[in-house]
């Protein structure tokens, strides 16, 4: 959030990843459904229907703040090399941090939707992100 707010360019635009998010509205909808419907106990993953890339997230955050996104598509191999050097020199951008920033983390919400008898969550991921950023 602060990187985008300060207008700092995102240099990892060459990496395409997908991440699951959960809007507060969808979370409240699911909690209400669990309280009011006869849902079997179990482990359910919670998430919006659409996974977003970090590049999409930054673009949405910028849109919500009325800013232009600054997404730089620095060469992937060069960034991996810089991160490797960062690991050796104990710098903030290292191999582990680069992996965490660029890896996929997508969960399926199919089980909870099936349990609640719905086809889609009420709020799209992009709309949830926009609402959240505008609330700050």
Kindly label every feature range from the protein language model:
Residues 4, 34-35, 116, 136:
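Hydrophobic residues in alpha-helical segments
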Residues 1-20, 69-106:
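Alpha-helical membrane-targeting segments
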Residues 111-113, 119, 123-136:
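Amphipathic terminal alpha-helices
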Residues 34-93, 109, 129-133:
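Mid/C-terminal beta-alpha module of Rossmann-like enzyme folds, strongest
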Residues 12-35, 41-42, 127:
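Substrate-positioning beta->alpha
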Residues 62, 117-118:
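A short, basic/aromatic helix-end/turn motif that makes direct DNA contacts
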Residues 15-18, 45, 49, 100, ...:
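Conserved short-loop catalytic and cofactor-binding motifs
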Residues 19-25, 52, 107, 120-123:
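Residue-level signal for the nucleotide or nucleotide-sugar donor/cofactor binding architecture
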């Amino acid at each position: 959030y602060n990187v985008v707010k300060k207008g700092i360019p995102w240099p990892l635009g060459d990496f395409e990843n997908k991440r699951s998010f959960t809007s507060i509205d969808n979370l409240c909808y699911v909690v209400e459904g669990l309280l009011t419907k006869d849902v079997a106990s179990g482990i359910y993953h919670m998430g919006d229907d659409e996974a977003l890339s970090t590049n999409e997230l930054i673009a949405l955050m910028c849109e919500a703040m009325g800013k232009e996104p600054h997404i730089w598509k620095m060469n992937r191999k060069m960034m991996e090399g810089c991160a490797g050097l960062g690991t050796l020199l104990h710098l903030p951008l290292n191999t582990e941090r680069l992996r965490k920033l660029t890896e996929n983390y997508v969960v399926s919400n199919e089980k909870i939707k099936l349990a609640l008898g719905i086809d889609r969550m009420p709020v799209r991921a992009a709309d949830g992100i926009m609402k959240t950023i505008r609330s700050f």
